[in-house]
């Protein structure tokens, strides 16, 4: 019998992490959970530990680790508890780990994802910031180690499935004309521009189609999420920005498309359920049950497409601008956006000021290219400080 794959789920208590464990639980003969990590949600992590009995658990700090150890001991569970950023890097590169679900939100997920790449792991990439912040560095590590990189974002999974199996980062050789990323348009697609100044965090977090965490829900509402996905697609598929297009598709049935030179368009369709791309990445090239109901085509409404409104939602254009600027501009964009979104969720910044803080940061922070992880993290910190000043000035 084939030995089960060892899985580390980084960001286990978030939306993607929970969905990953839902899929894994359906296939105990295929997967063994080696490590689970969480930032704040200790209760949820404890329940996951009871169910999956991982070898390692990682939490943010020593206090959280001590509290978790006490609960595990009381329950008779033997998972080893580690803490801190170095522990995330450690479990991502463990010899007994075959695949790493990289689903920590934001730039905080970069060091552990990069460690998995350097260790030659099969990387299930949900942390798009790894490529936004460190695209060249990350892809160089993947190539050097022979790591397998499989996208988990529904759009990039759709592109991956719509490209030839031997694509190998060669769009011209594969006859690719362009990549078309679809976007739902978010909860404010039809909201008058004048009303956007009064948007509340709770409104921004109510996505019309997908169930997601609060940060990514706000990014979806501003279209920054789609902008980050454009940058991610550039690195994943080695396609220049001029050959990446965004189409607003409110029904979220077509998850993305590839247009070929001969006029053909290949698309991947499915219900808006993250378990589908997660299962695809976990088992590729095989297909496994994800617990997702089959799509009923006869119950679908019309499938419609619109151009994105870049005046009302300038974050998407800012992402294209950062790609064109090159260097560390995408890292600056991401850092400033994380600061601005956190301020918005905390009630310190208006929704319409998020792109203003990001634009000011792109203009005010040096975007000269860094050639190391340490340099990129220093640029990230510089951009965060600048953006905090921008938030205070709004």
Swiss-Prot record:
Gene3D superfamilies for this protein: 1.10.1740.10, NAD(P)-binding Rossmann-like Domain
Annotated GO MF terms: 1-deoxy-D-xylulose-5-phosphate reductoisomerase activity; manganese ion binding; NADPH binding
Catalyzed reaction equations: 2-C-methyl-D-erythritol 4-phosphate + NADP(+) = 1-deoxy-D-xylulose 5-phosphate + NADPH + H(+)
Cofactor: Mg(2+); Mn(2+)
Biological process per Gene Ontology, one example term: isopentenyl diphosphate biosynthetic process, methylerythritol 4-phosphate pathway involved in terpenoid biosynthetic process
Binding site residues for Mn(2+): 153, 155, 229
EC numbers, comma separated: 1.1.1.267
SUPFAM superfamilies according to UniProt: 1-deoxy-D-xylulose-5-phosphate reductoisomerase, C-terminal domain, Glyceraldehyde-3-phosphate dehydrogenase-like, C-terminal domain, NAD(P)-binding Rossmann-fold domains
Keywords from the UniProt entry: Isoprene biosynthesis, Manganese, Metal-binding, NADP, Oxidoreductase
Transmembrane regions listed in the UniProt entry: none
UniProt KW Coiled coil keyword: no
Pfam families, per the entry: DXP_redisom_C, DXP_reductoisom, DXPR_C
Binding locations of 1-deoxy-D-xylulose 5-phosphate: 128, 154-155, 184, 207, 220, 225-226, 229
InterPro entries hit by this protein: DXP_reductoisomerase, DXP_reductoisomerase_C, DXP_reductoisomerase_N, DXPR_C, DXPR_C_sf, NAD(P)-bd_dom_sf
Recorded metabolic or biological pathway in which this protein acts: Isoprenoid biosynthesis; isopentenyl diphosphate biosynthesis via DXP pathway; isopentenyl diphosphate from 1-deoxy-D-xylulose 5-phosphate: step 1/6
Residues where NADPH binds: 13-16, 40-41, 127, 129, 213
Family according to the record: Belongs to the DXR family.
HAMAP family recorded: DXP_reductoisom
General function of this protein: Catalyzes the NADPH-dependent rearrangement and reduction of 1-deoxy-D-xylulose-5-phosphate (DXP) to 2-C-methyl-D-erythritol 4-phosphate (MEP).
Protein name in the entry: 1-deoxy-D-xylulose 5-phosphate reductoisomerase
Source organism: Chromobacterium violaceum (strain ATCC 12472 / DSM 30191 / JCM 1249 / CCUG 213 / NBRC 12614 / NCIMB 9131 / NCTC 9757 / MK)
């Amino acid at each position: 019998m084939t030995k089960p794959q060892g899985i580390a789920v980084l960001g286990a208590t978030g939306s993607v992490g929970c969905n990953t464990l839902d899929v894994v639980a359906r296939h105990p003969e295929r997967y063994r959970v080696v490590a689970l990590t969480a930032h704040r949600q200790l209760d949820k992590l404890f329940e996951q530990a009871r169910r999956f009995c991982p070898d390692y658990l990682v939490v943010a700090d020593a206090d959280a680790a001590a509290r978790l150890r006490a609960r595990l001991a009381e329950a008779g569970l033997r998972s080893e508890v580690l803490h801190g950023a170095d522990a995330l890097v450690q479990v991502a590169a463990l010899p007994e780990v075959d695949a790493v679900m990289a689903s920590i939100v934001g730039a905080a997920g970069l060091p552990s994802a990069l460690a998995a790449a350097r260790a030659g792991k099969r990387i299930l990439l949900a942390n798009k910031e790894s490529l936004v912040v460190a695209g060249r560095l990350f892809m160089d590590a993947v190539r050097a180690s022979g790591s397998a990189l499989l996208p988990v974002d529904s759009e990039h999974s759709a592109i991956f499935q719509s490209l030839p199996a031997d694509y190998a980062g060669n769009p011209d050789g594969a006859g690719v004309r362009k990549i078309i990323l679809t976007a739902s348009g978010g909860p404010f697609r039809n909201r008058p521009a004048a009303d956007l100044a009064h948007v509340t965090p709770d409104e921004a977090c109510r996505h019309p189609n997908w169930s997601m965490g609060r940060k990514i829900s706000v990014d979806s509402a501003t279209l920054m999420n789609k902008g980050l996905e454009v940058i991610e697609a550039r690195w994943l598929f080695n396609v220049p920005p001029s050959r990446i297009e965004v189409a607003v598709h409110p029904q979220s049935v077509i998850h993305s498309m590839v247009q070929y030179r001969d006029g053909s368009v290949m698309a991947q369709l499915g219900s808006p359920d993250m378990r589908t791309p997660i299962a695809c990445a976990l088992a590729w090239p095989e297909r496994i049950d994800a617990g997702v109901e089959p799509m009923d085509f006869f119950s679908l409404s019309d499938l419609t497409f619109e151009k994105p409104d870049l005046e009302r939602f300038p974050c998407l254009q800012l992402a294209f601008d950062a790609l064109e600027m090159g260097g560390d501009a995408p890292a600056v964009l991401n850092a400033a956006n994380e600061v601005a979104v956190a301020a918005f969720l905390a009630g310190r910044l208006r929704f319409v000021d998020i792109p203003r803080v990001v634009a000011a940061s792109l203009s005010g922070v040096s975007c000269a290219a860094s050639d190391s992880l340490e340099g990129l993290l220093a640029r990230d910190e510089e951009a965060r400080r600048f953006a905090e000043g921008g938030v205070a000035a709004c």
